[in-house]
C-alpha cells in the first residue's frame, strides 16, 4: 500500500497491563521521525489522559457513524468499549516518510496486517501472570471484578503471540524498551528502504569505480 520512500508501520500489542503503552511512549522519546497513531475510543477518559494525545474520546453514536463512513482501518470492542484506528491519520504520516506506531490489541493487529502486509508487529508479554495482575492492581484504575475479567482475557490474548513478528518479555522495562528500539532501527536499515534513501550515495560510489 505504501512505497519504499514512505514511513514504516509498527504494531505493538499486549494483554491489558502488559506495558505496551509505556513502552511505546519510551520508544517515541528514544527514536526520531516516529509517531503514535492516536486512536478513537468510547471509553471514559482516565486521570492524566489528554484529548487528542492519548485518545480521541467520542460517544458510541459518533463511533458507529465513523465506522459506517469507513473512517477506521480497524476497530474492535474491548471490555465493552469501542476502539478504532483512523485510516487518514496513518496514511498521511506514512506518505510523509514518518514511521507510525499502533498501540492496539491482537484483534486490531489482525485487521491491520490484512490492510498493511508490510507492517512490523511486536507482541509484549509479562514475565508471569502474577506480575501482570500486580501491574493491573497498581494502576488503581479498575475494580477487583474488572481486574479478574482482564486476567481471564489476558490468557486468551497471550495465545495469539505466534501471529506476531517479534516477541518481547517486559520484565526489565529499560531492556524491553531497548529491544523495541532495536526492532525499529533494524527495520529502517532493510535493503529495500536504504536503496531509495541512499540512492545518491550509492550512485556516486558505484560511478566512481
Curated annotation (Swiss-Prot):
Gene3D superfamilies the UniProt entry points to: Guanylate Kinase phosphate binding domain (3.30.63.10), P-loop containing nucleotide triphosphate hydrolases (3.40.50.300)
Keywords: ATP-binding, Cytoplasm, Kinase, Nucleotide-binding, Transferase
Binding-site residues, ATP: 14-21
Keyword flag Nucleotide-binding: yes
SMART domains named in the record: GuKc (SM00072)
EC assignment: 2.7.4.8
Molecular functions per Gene Ontology: ATP binding; guanylate kinase activity
Domain Guanylate kinase-like as annotated: residue spans: 7-185
Enzyme class: transferase
Organism domain of life: Bacteria
Compartments, as annotated in UniProt: Cytoplasm
Matching Pfam families: Guanylate_kin
Reactions accelerated catalytically: GMP + ATP = GDP + ADP
CDD domains assigned to the protein according to its UniProt record, in alphabetical order: GMPK
CC annotations in GO: cytosol
Role of this protein: Essential for recycling GMP and indirectly, cGMP.
Protein family membership: Belongs to the guanylate kinase family.
Protein's UniProt name: Guanylate kinase
Amino acid at each position: 500500500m505504501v512505497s519504499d520512500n514512505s514511513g514504516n508501520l509498527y504494531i505493538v500489542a499486549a494483554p491489558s497491563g502488559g506495558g505496551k503503552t509505556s513502552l511505546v511512549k519510551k520508544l517515541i522519546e528514544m527514536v526520531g521521525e516516529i509517531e503514535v497513531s492516536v486512536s478513537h475510543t468510547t471509553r471514559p477518559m482516565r486521570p492524566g489522559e489528554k484529548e487528542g494525545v492519548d485518545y480521541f474520546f467520542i460517544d458510541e453514536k459518533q463511533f458507529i457513524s465513523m465506522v459506517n463512513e469507513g473512517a477506521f482501518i480497524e476497530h474492535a470492542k474491548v471490555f465493552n468499549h469501542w476502539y478504532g484506528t483512523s485510516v487518514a491519520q496513518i496514511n498521511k504520516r506514512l506518505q510523509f516518510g514518518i514511521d507510525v506506531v499502533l498501540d492496539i490489541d491482537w484483534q486490531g493487529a489482525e485487521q491491520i496486517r490484512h490492510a498493511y502486509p508490510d507492517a512490523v508487529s511486536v507482541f509484549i508479554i509479562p514475565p508471569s501472570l502474577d506480575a501482570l495482575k500486580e501491574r493491573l492492581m497498581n494502576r488503581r484504575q479498575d475494580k477487583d471484578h474488572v481486574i479478574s475479567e482482564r486476567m481471564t482475557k489476558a490468557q486468551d490474548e497471550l495465545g495469539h503471540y505466534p501471529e506476531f513478528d517479534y516477541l518481547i518479555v517486559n520484565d526489565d522495562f529499560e531492556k524491553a524498551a531497548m529491544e523495541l528500539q532495536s526492532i525499529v532501527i533494524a527495520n529502517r536499515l532493510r535493503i529495500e528502504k536504504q536503496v531509495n534513501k541512499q540512492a545518491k550515495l550509492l550512485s556516486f560510489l558505484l560511478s566512481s569505480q
